[in-house]
Amino acid sequence: MEYRIERDTLGEIKVPADKLWAAQTQRSKENFPIGTEQMPLEIVKAFAILKKSAALSNQKLGKLSEEKAEAIVEAADEVIAGKWNEHFPLVVWQTGSGTQSNMNVNEVIANRGNQILKEKGSDVHIHPNDDVNMSQSSNDTFPTALHVACVIAVENHVLPAITKLKETLVEKVTAFEHIIKIGRTHLQDATPLTLGQEISGWHRMLEKTERMIAESNTYMKELAIGGTAVGTGINAHPKFGEMVSEEISQFTGKQFVSAPNKFHALTSHDEVVYTHGALKALAADLMKIANDVRWLASGPRSGLGEIIIPANEPGSSIMPGKVNPTQSEALTMVVAQVMGNDATIGFAASQGNFELNVFKPVIAYNFLQSAHLLADAIVSFNDNCAVGIEADEEVINENVNRSLMLVTALNPHIGYENAAKIAKHAHKEGLTLKEAALQSGLLTEEQFDEIVDPKKMIAPKE
């Protein structure tokens, strides 16, 4: 491998000749050989959006020449397009402010910008600190990139995935609204409801958590940029934060604003905790839905077997003909990961000391992992399971007819204690509920048939 010599304030260091990064990136690469978790490319691209917006703002403020600004913007656009992904090699486990990743972006954009200028015959030189990082600090750029990346992940991936599954569930609610099944509480038989009603509960969960996520995400649209090192805005124009936020908004189509208090924006990540908490709420509901699906599909002959799920792949390497609820299993594993990520984010966000929190990279990594896992898992569950759910009406009807909990309808007519005696007698003697009721002498066959009608038990009545 061929190398070139780069220099920084610590001296000279060898850098691979074909890479756009420079000394500080190389030092980080050598000093932190920890794990395989790379800084998410979403953070890199959010940084590039920020650097582009900063260059345009500094140009408008008369602090950066038009020639340099144009080269920085062009280089940043290439980074955003993914042209230089291999030039961002750093891992998450680095300085807690994300300084090395900020410098990685500064160095790549500066070197690529200089190539662009050279191709145009210019001898102007872009410096990674003085030009690309002008009016900025790692302390305000990393939280800005973090918020931009997380907002995009939530709005472009998580929320559309929820909408897709919601639409499928609405179709199932309508398709199954006539199918009366036995309800279950504590994993025990309860009073009846329709399969459509049961699924409507799932739909409402998604509808509610979707709104919770969207509402919490508004706080993530406050950006730290303009606070520089400790929140005072030293070395930045007073309007810089506002101008950059407007540029980022125009480029992303998201309504970002300059954070009203930069001291808070650098040392606290409560917005991330709040939004990820909403993602955790979604995850909790998805766990419930996935579990319901696999319970209801259990069988085929020794389980509940009230719904049929698509047979996507052989279920066992030893038991032929087995169909497992694999989409539910994948989704519940994602939920477990999200729950763990939430614990990490909550702890990391509690570690702000004085003017800075230095757990930023791990917060970014875990949030983005949660967002993408949830989005992918929801779409997979929808496409490979939910859309193909069918009701086994024969099994459902059999379970309803065998249930002793229909006795609940007798409570207003013969009292709770008498109804309980009938249910216990039926269970002990192996009788149907009707047979036990008639043996009690408390009501006639006509009265029983009139009262114990599942169709009359699925909604309130006067």
From Swiss-Prot:
It comes from the Bacteria. Keywords: Cytoplasm, Lyase, Tricarboxylic acid cycle. Transmembrane segments: none annotated. The active site is at 186 (proton donor/acceptor), 316. It is found in: Cytoplasm. Its EC number is 4.2.1.2. GO terms for biological process: fumarate metabolic process; malate metabolic process; tricarboxylic acid cycle. GO terms for molecular function: fumarate hydratase activity. PROSITE patterns: FUMARATE_LYASES. Pfam families: FumaraseC_C, Lyase_1. Gene3D superfamilies: Fumarase/aspartase (C-terminal domain), Fumarase/aspartase (Central domain), Fumarase/aspartase (N-terminal domain). Substrate binds at residues 97-99, 127-130, 137-139, 185, 317, 322-324. GO terms for cellular component: cytoplasm. The keyword Cytoplasm applies. There are 2 substrate-binding sites: the catalytic A site, and the non-catalytic B site that may play a role in the transfer of substrate or product between the active site and the solvent. Alternatively, the B site may bind allosteric effectors. Belongs to the class-II fumarase/aspartase family. Fumarase subfamily. Involved in the TCA cycle. Catalyzes the stereospecific interconversion of fumarate to L-malate. Homotetramer. This is Fumarate hydratase class II.
